């Protein structure tokens, strides 16, 4: 496992994105306060960032606490792990650093505010997203596992982001 992030969401979604790759659809610059989420949902820029491997959204979440785990060329241990859904494959092209953030950062852009570096090395990856319950005794932890497999080129994405990725 590359990294585990505990998060408390405020904005009904998570975004995994490449920086500086995310700047490309905006001519190389995003102004502080700009609402790029609206651009992605009302123009073809949303499809562009998915197809070019710039971003991967996890949408339709309830506010609250989640664990997000990043696996690189390895798979999660299935002991005490119940898979709720699997979406594959997305592609991510990490040209700089890969960041995790609450979707709110795309609502009101500010460089590096609320971003967490996922510590995934540069490269092209096909990514499987799994929504899972981690069972710890009587407790259920709501988790998203991103399983990265290194590849030589971007593939054709044959999955759409879910509008409802809730695990409750």
Segment roles from a protein language model:
Residues 1-91, 136-168:
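Primarily secretory-pathway and cell-envelope proteins
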Residues 130-134:
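Short beta-strand-plus-loop segments that form exposed binding edges in beta-rich domains
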Residues 120-128:
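A glycine-anchored, Pro-Gly-centered beta-turn/N-cap motif
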């Amino acid at each position: 496992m590359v990294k585990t992030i505990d998060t408390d969401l405020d904005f009904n979604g998570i975004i995994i994105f490449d920086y500086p790759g995310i700047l490309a659809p905006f001519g190389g610059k995003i102004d502080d306060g700009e609402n790029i989420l609206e651009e992605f949902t009302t123009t073809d820029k949303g499809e562009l960032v998915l197809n070019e491997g710039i971003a991967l959204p996890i949408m339709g979440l309830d506010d609250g606490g989640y664990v997000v785990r990043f696996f690189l060329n390895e798979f999660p241990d299935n002991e005490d792990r119940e898979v709720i859904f699997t979406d594959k494959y997305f592609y991510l092209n990490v040209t700089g650093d890969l960041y995790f953030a609450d979707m709110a950062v795309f609502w009101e852009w500010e460089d590096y505010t609320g971003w967490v570096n996922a510590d995934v090395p540069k490269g092209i990856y096909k990514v499987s997203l799994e929504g899972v319950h981690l069972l710890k005794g009587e407790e259920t932890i709501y988790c998203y596992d991103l399983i990265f497999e290194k590849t030589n080129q971007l593939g054709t994405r044959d999955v759409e982001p879910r509008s409802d990725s809730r695990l409750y």
